[in-house]
Amino acid sequence: MESQQLSQHSHISHGSACASVTSKEVHTNQDPLDVSASKTEECEKASTKANSQQTTTPASSAVPENPHHASPQTAQSHSPQNGPYPQQCMMTQNQANPSGWSFYGHPSMIPYTPYQMSPMYFPPGPQSQFPQYPSSVGTPLSTPSPESGNTFTDSSSADSDMTSTKKYVRPPPMLTSPNDFPNWVKTYIKFLQNSNLGGIIPTVNGKPVRQITDDELTFLYNTFQIFAPSQFLPTWVKDILSVDYTDIMKILSKSIEKMQSDTQEANDIVTLANLQYNGSTPADAFETKVTNIIDRLNNNGIHINNKVACQLIMRGLSGEYKFLRYTRHRHLNMTVAELFLDIHAIYEEQQGSRNSKPNYRRNLSDEKNDSRSYTNTTKPKVIARNPQKTNNSKSKTARAHNVSTSNNSPSTDNDSISKSTTEPIQLNNKHDLHLGQELTESTVNHTNHSDDELPGHLLLDSGASRTLIRSAHHIHSASSNPDINVVDAQKRNIPINAIGDLQFHFQDNTKTSIKVLHTPNIAYDLLSLNELAAVDITACFTKNVLERSDGTVLAPIVQYGDFYWVSKRYLLPSNISVPTINNVHTSESTRKYPYPFIHRMLAHANAQTIRYSLKNNTITYFNESDVDWSSAIDYQCPDCLIGKSTKHRHIKGSRLKYQNSYEPFQYLHTDIFGPVHNLPKSAPSYFISFTDETTKFRWVYPLHDRREDSILDVFTTILAFIKNQFQASVLVIQMDRGSEYTNRTLHKFLEKNGITPCYTTTADSRAHGVAERLNRTLLDDCRTQLQCSGLPNHLWFSAIEFSTIVRNSLASPKSKKSARQHAGLAGLDISTLLPFGQPVIVNDHNPNSKIHPRGIPGYALHPSRNSYGYIIYLPSLKKTVDTTNYVILQGKESRLDQFNYDALTFDEDLNRLTASYHSFIASNEIQESNDLNIESDHDFQSDIELHPEQPRNVLSKAVSPTDSTPPSTHTEDSKRVSKTNIRAPREVDPNISESNILPSKKRSSTPQISNIESTGSGGMHKLNVPLLAPMSQSNTHESSHASKSKDFRHSDSYSENETNHTNVPISSTGGTNNKTVPQISDQETEKRIIHRSPSIDASPPENNSSHNIVPIKTPTTVSEQNTEESIIADLPLPDLPPESPTEFPDPFKELPPINSRQTNSSLGGIGDSNAYTTINSKKRSLEDNETEIKVSRDTWNTKNMRSLEPPRSKKRIHLIAAVKAVKSIKPIRTTLRYDEAITYNKDIKEKEKYIEAYHKEVNQLLKMKTWDTDEYYDRKEIDPKRVINSMFIFNKKRDGTHKARFVARGDIQHPDTYDSGMQSNTVHHYALMTSLSLALDNNYYITQLDISSAYLYADIKEELYIRPPPHLGMNDKLIRLKKSLYGLKQSGANWYETIKSYLIQQCGMEEVRGWSCVFKNSQVTICLFVDDMVLFSKNLNSNKRIIDKLKMQYDTKIINLGESDEEIQYDILGLEIKYQRGKYMKLGMENSLTEKIPKLNVPLNPKGRKLSAPGQPGLYIDQQELELEEDDYKMKVHEMQKLIGLASYVGYKFRFDLLYYINTLAQHILFPSKQVLDMTYELIQFIWNTRDKQLIWHKSKPVKPTNKLVVISDASYGNQPYYKSQIGNIYLLNGKVIGGKSTKASLTCTSTTEAEIHAISESVPLLNNLSYLIQELDKKPITKGLLTDSKSTISIIISNNEEKFRNRFFGTKAMRLRDEVSGNHLHVCYIETKKNIADVMTKPLPIKTFKLLTNKWIH
């Protein structure tokens, strides 16, 4: 046992003759301290030899500097300075040693040590001598010193035995490492035994045989200090010496106790490795013995898992129990308990058979024969297994080497299976497995047979080109063959010892011989079917026999496991011995470099490369002859086998010889391709192909998914088709090992139909070459067809089907025939074929009207399978049809998007080619039938929606003809082509925008205004843009006739001299004097008549007053005016500097450049809504839109066909589609999994903290009785839908603590296991902000609490089970849940109901109606967020009483009691709050942002110029289609989700000034262009730069004891995609901003007034709810105000005139707003736009304006 570690000490200091103590392995029943006598003698001989060579030299120091190279001391060496008897401690050669102490005869054996300088040194007394022990029988004592020749005699026995000689006592080695202390103690104890001190050594019970004397104690202490320096002592030894420095006996006692424990562990390991059981003893006794051993090892830190334990038990089974090796060896999850159940069953059966029927149980050979017959109940499958399975893993390599050393006896029949070939594990000492090491499969030696090998048989291999065998007993005429080069699947050389003949004697008494190679380095004996075919022998897997070509059966084939075998009983044995074979071509090399060493030295290069390099002198220093190349032949480097593992080679043409065994359509190849992403739901994502082995005929079928039933439907279809059409039955189907083929449903189907499934090797595509090559060819054709035709990607399967039709008709270069000819079908009639994507005109048999055009443009796809028609794609109808009513069109270009309708002509060649087909149809037509033009019933792509979210009316809006288009052209086009658009985009048309939906030139050049709206500029006092519409001089509410000017966008200058215009008086929006603007003459306008209708946009009559408050009604009382003024008072509005009156500017000088992008600025993203839009008129009447939007008939326009570009390899993302697809921001995972936090965590300190948190969580779960610990359930007995997966998640909290949480996978929870009607409520953020605001105004105390493991207090009603935590080690068991585990769907609702009931019933609280998780009583308000509670009260004792009641039921922690009168800091739900009662409150997130933002990997610029605003006006997101690689796109989307997710969290908490930018960028998460990412980076940079900003609240000091709730509203008209408006609202309580909202209007508004009304109507419900909450929490009167900068909206609210409503929708919206304002007593007031802080919610603002509107409430 000690040999491995003791051998490390190759030298000993102080002139010791014995370098180390080497011993033989200790027998298990031997004393662990006993050492073989033979080894002792050997060591003493070595000591004698070493001492004889020593020379004595003077020493300059008593202590050697290097203990490993100490020089011997002379006789004049110094003695200890603090002892009065130096000579007794240091004897010279001339002094007589005391009897029994001859060890000190050599002066160098006791050096002078620093220990003796210590005042604690314990010297012997004046009269004490060194211990003298009488010589006892059998005690090896000293002999005369070989150096001095003197004889040292014992003084007590000198007279009786003067001539007796004694041997020297061997000294212990010097301790040099704490790790060597256990082995050193053993040698030290042996030293004491040899010194006649064995009686003082403690026994197993810790007590010595006799008492130790003082002299012996002195000797023990001194020798221990000399040979065990303190710096090399283990910690536990130092701890003992620190208490009592002389307590060496205690050290020895503990050491012996440890050695005894180690001996027991070693005995248990050896016993477990050498188990034997044959039924001679009761099975209960055997089970008890094994389980006790396993339990002891597990308790001592040696973990034996189930798999290893089962392996060890099965290896020891013999007799009738041996068959369990074969039946159980493939059960991966087998447990020891299950294995013993089988053993008990056999034992009981064995006992019963002995009493009744002696032959009741079959022998093992019968079992094996039965198993073979059972496995052959299904059709066999052709296999092509790797002949070198040993190269697949390291374990298989070890197995191969074991086989090479075994001697296999020749097997003559199948009964050889019963012969045991296993060897027990030889673990002879404990060092084979250290303490704490887990016993795994690698520890167990492999047998000389593979786990899946059938002993006594040859493996049939169709992929092996040569036959290889391990045993030499069947090789005839063996000879060496150094020239043969055989490689395995990894292209590594297989060493071949010999070549010979393998002779068969088959059952028809015929003999056959084939060549065989001998090698011991393979896992199976391989029989090559190629070599059998060379001697006219083939394997028929339909009959399971080897047969000749004439049908003569030679031998049966046996299926075992996944392979097919032939018995070795048909082999003729030879007389060649194993050593003869193994020594063939083996030469002895002497004094040469071993090849494995050179192989590793030269980077694991192969032998051929190394030899070639040495021959050419590219490597110097040694030659080729210096290397022993004999081992290079059979050397297998395990590292190379693992690192360079490849797939096995496939022999070209190896399958051809078996094709003749099958008739057409009996052997099929199949494979599935897919999925194809980014397609409509109606288009298929997969296709499945079939290829006949003999005829190479191909079929393809579309699939939308890979479910079992979908695959089964296709198999049913094709089998029925082959049976009915070709009168053939499919026998074998070859496929890969995908789950769609290996599922039980398909397996049963094939078995029922008598079809053999032939599976290929996993991940071996070359073995499935026929199907794989077909899919690759079809995909190449598909891409080519789509590229050539320009058709959209969703028609990809039509291209596949077209290619399949053509490929079946093309001749094969090998067979010179086509697949159709092989199948007996006629050739393809090319007159019925059209080019893929050929433009055609299809007759519309059901037009909308009689004057509607009858032709619909379309594109030919492929011939129909169900009729004589053709499948044609109609873009305008978004579907495919099966029809014969079409006319072929052919142009100069073949690309779909390059066709020019005017240039289309009939192609003569195509017409001539198809003439015969059309004449055939014409001759057989009796009358025109509209029934032929039907939608294809078979086609999967009928009624395809090109994009599920694309508006259907967009496609009908095309660009109208330009002014330069001649009228005649327009007329001709309308005659030729239907008004309906003839095409549809591939995904979403990238050109769908205002530029091609609306006539951009005319519309953009004329800012049309039918009347003046005072709110167009939000109440500005001047108008900076000319109004180019003629206006009436009167003050009526009627709109005048509007004129539209021609395009002057490209003009360089525009002045009064160039146009004739008249001045029109216009009312200023700010109430200033009327100004005049030029009117464009009629000659330069396009006249359009607009019906007069009542206008709601005109401003109401108003006086020239500077008063900015417009009341709802017009009372003249002073009290009403004071109320309205009080609403404005105390609001954080900006202070505007007074403006001097200015002249109205020249409108044409300040006219902004007109750009089509400004017409809908936010179509591209953040638009310019402030620079010009807010001062321009934002109106456009509904009638104007209807007049301007015209539908183009030029549907073949090149520009509009651009969306049908050919497919590209990159992902194409359109802006509008991406914006519409965004529903919500995907939450980003911030937690760690178990493997991330513990298993692979390289941070040791963090890992330890997570482990501590893990155990803390487990203890808490057990404490809360989360599951039933009394009963464990078997997984098979429980309904799977009631089993919930679980996992541990870890995270680091903001306070630095590490948290572990055991959660359930509620995301995959079955709907039947929870009540979907239950709600998990938490406090609304507005409720929390309202409570905080009221607390500040009323001097409330704020207390923060936390309830540990809150969910676990709630019981669970449903019957649910989870898998136990990993540390329990019960993977196959389930436990029933009793508590609401975190992660379950119902846990949140259960906890809410539990805590709600307790607060109401036990704490006297009541929940505020409409505001969940807000509880109150007369003194306390509670806001609940899961397990966090915030308490508000006027009296702190009220909070304490609630806390005491909570602690009675729940584990409640007080995070912050809030009793101080100074500033208190809180961390409440992510908000960092600084609160001083009665003064102020500051809300921010500086610490959190400082920690989180750097982790986002955003390129921050801390030293650069800081951004002053989150965005600037005039920025547009480019609308060009984005093209990205798939992986790059996913990565950028994921990055956007992280960045916008953090920004949203911050914005909705307190940074309401950023909500507009966050909302706009959130709509572009799925459009991660560089521009969008840059804008997002700028937003994050701005948040980083302003992370120290806080939302500032000050205590309000109202004149009256009332609460004032105000909402400020604003809207930006038409600045979002699809002309949606952006609306924003800010809510203030007593002058403090408590919330904000910025969102895109759900409906499209037709004017600014509509947008403003929509914004106000969106704010009123929340305003009323907040009002109710405030009244419940604070019993004060409340005043509600609504502020807007739209005077038109105010006029509608106060007016009773319903004639202003232009339509029913607008009228109902306005009337509802009137009712809400009057019914809820809202005070509607006007506010100037410059003071409207809600403006930051609706548009990007200049830096100065942004700061002006926000610096009073956030800074």
Swiss-Prot record:
- Specify the Integrase catalytic domain's residue ranges: 660-835
Its Enzyme Commission number(s) read 3.4.23.-, 2.7.7.49, 2.7.7.7, 3.1.26.4
Q: Which residues bind Mg(2+) 2?
A: D1346, D1427, D1428
* GO molecular function terms noted in the UniProt entry: aspartic-type endopeptidase activity; ATP binding; DNA binding; DNA-directed DNA polymerase activity; RNA binding; RNA-directed DNA polymerase activity; RNA-DNA hybrid ribonuclease activity; zinc ion binding
| Reaction(s) the record says it catalyses | DNA(n) + a 2'-deoxyribonucleoside 5'-triphosphate = DNA(n+1) + diphosphate; Endonucleolytic cleavage to 5'-phosphomonoester
What residue spans carry the region label Disordered?
Answer: 1-93, 126-173, 352-421, 956-1087, 1092-1111, 1130-1187
Chain intervals with Polar residues compositional bias: 48-60, 71-93, 127-152, 1005-1015, 1054-1082, 1101-1111
For binding Mg(2+) 1, which residues are annotated in this chain's numbering?
D671, D736
Q: What keywords appear on the UniProt entry?
A: Aspartyl protease, ATP-binding, Cytoplasm, DNA integration, DNA recombination, DNA-binding, DNA-directed DNA polymerase, Endonuclease, Hydrolase, Magnesium, Metal-binding, Multifunctional enzyme, Nuclease, Nucleotide-binding, Nucleotidyltransferase, Nucleus, Phosphoprotein, Protease, RNA-binding, RNA-directed DNA polymerase, Transferase, Transposable element, Transposition, Viral release from host cell, Virion maturation, Zinc, Zinc-finger
Residues flagged as site, Cleavage: H401, N402, N582, N583, A1217, A1218
* Subcellular compartments: Cytoplasm; Nucleus
Q: Which residues bind Mg(2+) 3?
A: D1610, E1652, D1685
Q: What is known of its domains?
A: The C-terminal RNA-binding region of CA is sufficient for all its nucleocapsid-like chaperone activities.
Please give the function described in this protein's UniProt entry. Capsid protein (CA) is the structural component of the virus-like particle (VLP), forming the shell that encapsulates the retrotransposons dimeric RNA genome. The particles are assembled from trimer-clustered units and there are holes in the capsid shells that allow for the diffusion of macromolecules. CA also has nucleocapsid-like chaperone activity, promoting primer tRNA(i)-Met annealing to the multipartite primer-binding site (PBS), dimerization of Ty1 RNA and initiation of reverse transcription. The aspartyl protease (PR) mediates the proteolytic cleavages of the Gag and Gag-Pol polyproteins after assembly of the VLP.
Q: What is this protein called?
A: Transposon Ty1-GR1 Gag-Pol polyprotein
The taxonomic lineage of its organism, from the top, reads: Eukaryota, Fungi, Dikarya, Ascomycota, Saccharomycotina
